[in-house]
Design a protein with these regions (language model features):
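Residues at helix-coil transition
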Residues: 49, 174-178, 206
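Glycine-rich phosphate/pyrophosphate-binding beta-alpha loops
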Residues: 38, 64, 90-97
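Beta-strand scaffold of nucleotide-dependent catalytic cores
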Residues: 6-9, 87-90, 118-119
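C-terminal glycine/acidic-rich active-site capping loop/insertion
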Residues: 75, 80-82, 98, 104-189, ...
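Predominantly a Rossmann-like dinucleotide-binding segment in NAD(P)-dependent oxidoreductases
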Residues: 1-69, 74, 208
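Short arginine-rich
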Residues: 197-207
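A structural signal for well-ordered alpha-helical segments within the folded catalytic domains
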Residues: 34, 38-42, 163-170, 189-196
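Short, flexible active-site-adjacent loop segments at beta-strand->alpha-helix junctions, enriched
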Residues: 12-17, 61, 92, 113-115, ...
Length: 217
């Protein structure tokens, strides 16, 4: 491919405090790593086809730590066999009025032959209005400036839903009906691997130690 063998990855994802509060109100034991960074870990393992052998992480203690005992942000370094390294970060620290409707995400992949940089915060599509707009994930929060396309499941327009959730739902229905694995759908093993990595990241953030990650298959 045009990138060649992947040598490093840098990625980050931010939720507003309003979205993070909605998340933790439903799952009191969740963390930025398990709930939010998991998207980055999933993409990382999918893009690279590799699983890390160790995790080192550290986290910030702020509003969410005081109220819920959860870290406000988590930043990690993952090491892989062959020398590949990834730096990932997840934050719940941006204020309620941050213009992303759901999440702000960036993902960069560097290889021997090239690099890819994706800015998935959609800052190129902005709406501003004197009228307040409800956030799609947190409708109780009124926004006057918002980034179109920053709601991860997609957006409603003219009574129809467009975006990733629509495509994933159709793929799931087709897979069940046709008894085949669609290439855009994760497997149970994929989910298990991502959760194992996320738990290792949390363990490192809590202990301050490098956590080895072993794989049996």
């Amino acid at each position: 491919g045009y990138i060649g063998d992947i040598t490093s990855v840098k990625a980050s994802i931010y939720l507003t405090q309003a979205v993070a509060r909605a998340v933790i109100s439903r799952a009191p034991t969740t963390t930025p790593s398990i709930n939010t960074m998991t998207y980055l870990v999933d993409l990382l393992t999918w893009f690279s086809g590799k699983r890390p052998i160790s995790a080192y992480a550290s986290g910030a203690k702020g509003v969410f730590y005081e109220e819920f005992g959860a870290l406000d942000s988590t930043w990690t370094v993952l090491n892989f066999d062959g020398g590949m390294v990834a730096t990932l970060g997840a934050s719940w620290e941006v204020p309620v009025f941050w213009p992303a409707n759901n999440a702000s995400m960036e993902f960069e992949v560097f290889g021997r032959e090239g690099a890819v940089s994706v800015k998935d915060d959609h800052r190129d599509m902005v709406i501003a209005s004197n009228k307040s707009m409800p956030g799609p994930y947190t409708p109780e929060v009124d926004m006057h400036v918002a980034l179109f396309g920053s709601n991860m499941p997609g957006d409603w327009a003219l009574g129809e839903h467009f975006g990733a959730m629509q495509e994933e739902t159709h793929a799931f229905i087709n897979s069940v009906g046709q008894r085949r694995q669609d290439s855009i759908l994760a497997t149970g093993r994929d989910g298990f691997d991502v959760l194992s990595i996320s738990l290792a990241i949390d363990q490192s953030a809590n202990t301050g130690e490098v956590v080895p990650i072993t794989w049996t298959s």
